[in-house]
Amino acid sequence: MDNSSQSKPSSSSSSHSPSPAAITPTQRTTRDSGLCSTIDIPEIQAQCIDNLNSHYLGKGTYGLVEKTRYRKTRQDDFRPAAIKYSSQLHMATLIREAKVMWDLRNHPNIIKIYGLYKSPRNGQGVVMEYMDCGSMADLLYDRTHINYTIDHVASWMFQLSSAVDFFHSNSQVHRDLKLQNMLLSDRYRTMKLCDFGTFTSMHQSMTSNRGTPITMAPEVFRCEQYNMKSDIYSIGIIMWQIIARNHPYRRDLSVPGLLYNVATANLRPQELECNPILSEFYKKCWNDNADIRPTSSECVEYFTLLKDEYPNGSVPLSDSSTNGPAETPPPHAHRPTMLGTSSGSGIGSNNRTPTASKLLNPQQPGQGHRRNRSETFVVQPDLPYPTVPGEAGASRIPKSQSEAKNFRDRAKSEQRQPHRDARPPPPFEHRRDSNDEEKHAVFMNICSNEETRPIDPDTRDEKSLEIFHQHCDNNKQYADAWVIKKEVMRAKHELIAQWPQHDHTVELLERKYYLEQEIARYRDIQDDNYFSTERM
């Protein structure tokens, strides 16, 4: 209420106390503040979905994903689409993600949502556009026969930074940027962001562990106050992954060991032999000091210049196995990993051998614009673990480096090894992939809880580091025990459900035994009668 609207009391009423001004209640903002309501998202009718041609694509973080055909009205033709369903437990998360995507639907590098659809078979779902080339992780690590150049890197990174800058300009942050959330289409030339389940507004106090460990900013793991610069850190890691076409960290490194060393020992991906124009930028993006990282608009400006220098990002990718253009892959189910919810690379997810990239190296300043020979980005040999650049870094935390290595070795030794002998596998061994993902989720929830998360250690104090390691180990053991208990209870309920069938089987066996005895007794009587007749 404006002050001008409150008239002062007249002199005739000066003996009376003026009425107090109305107090405006403080509105409590939540991470859903500013999002559209569900009624703003159109409800898709059953006749607009071709259920007969729908088939399973894969399993996401909160439910399954199907490929289907969708049309806006009965007069329109069907076109490919994807439907993301959710279990009842995570329905609120799915609806919230739909609201976010609906608000961002006008950006060309963000997945478009068509509406909400209630399936008689799978329940509530969100219908969105279908990206026919899979994720960036699929391209980098699975389809190594498909080649790309620095032109495509510049184009993809420009599209990514453009989408990030779009919601950063509205004071919103994604918090889970990764290769698996970058979907490709149009012969791998168009990139769009998906999975906005962790999306939130900057008006909220953000200190919780949200995101994927490989691209999680160190301040997020330290449970410090963080901001939009956490997305910039993820951009730096993604840029390194696409340039190197490699995994940023050792595949045998445990999740707690990775997060601890990134947050306290400044662990980063290996050095690449590439143009300093590229390496200096992604190193600036993943700087431990968030204030040094560039803004999203500066990222757009940088990748715009890089794209102008290498403008052939619109050229279709080539397939080295056929010496022709890369074909659109058939739809397939995404692989589960222990670190994320979808396909792609993850620490300990599988045993794929990292493949070196075959990108064309940007020429040094002063050379001609177009390249006349092919060069490759070369990954240097494994660096000491963890990498601390310069003498200053070596003198800063010599003990924490050794302690971090011991922590990694101890965590690694606790991991279950695959069975190589002929003995039968232990119970629930066939569910290891899903268990690892669930254990990681439980572990991250424990570490984000103010009552159970480890207190940040003093890297100069050996006792403080030891206590931190023990706390992390206890949290990991608790997560393992919680998941095992859940599996045991599930097996118990399955046995209870099968008990009536077991009773029926026992009853049938008893009847069978009784009949066998009766038949044997009848045969004995017949034999006795036969011998009696012969003697007579």
Swiss-Prot record:
Segments of skewed composition (Basic and acidic residues): 405-438
UniProt entry keywords in alphabetical sequence: ATP-binding, Developmental protein, Kinase, Magnesium, Metal-binding, Nucleotide-binding, Phosphoprotein, Serine/threonine-protein kinase, Transferase, Wnt signaling pathway
Consequences of knocking out this gene: Embryonic lethal with severely defective embryonic morphogenesis with no endoderm and excess mesoderm.
Residues of the active site: 176
One cellular-component annotation, GO: striated muscle dense body
The encoding gene: mom-4
Disordered: annotated span: 1-34, 314-438
EC numbers for this chain: 2.7.11.25
Protein modification: May be autophosphorylated.
Domain Protein kinase: 51-305
Matching Gene3D superfamilies: Transferase(Phosphotransferase) domain 1
Cofactor(s), names only, from the UniProt record: Mg(2+)
GO molecular function: ATP binding; MAP kinase kinase kinase activity; metal ion binding; protein kinase activity; protein serine kinase activity; protein serine/threonine kinase activity
Annotated binding of ATP, by residue: 57-65, 84
Oligomer and partners: Interacts with, and is activated by, tap-1.
GO BP: any one term: asymmetric protein localization involved in cell fate determination
Compositional bias ranges of the Low complexity kind: 1-20
Family stated for the protein in its record: Belongs to the protein kinase superfamily. STE Ser/Thr protein kinase family. MAP kinase kinase kinase subfamily.
Name listed for the protein in its UniProt record: Mitogen-activated protein kinase kinase kinase mom-4
Biased composition (Polar residues): 315-325, 350-366
Catalysed transformations (reactions): L-seryl-[protein] + ATP = O-phospho-L-seryl-[protein] + ADP + H(+); L-threonyl-[protein] + ATP = O-phospho-L-threonyl-[protein] + ADP + H(+)
Main function: Part of the Wnt signaling pathway essential for the specification of the mesodermal cell fate in early embryos. Stimulates the wrm-1/lit-1-dependent phosphorylation of pop-1 and plays a role in the initial nuclear accumulation of wrm-1.
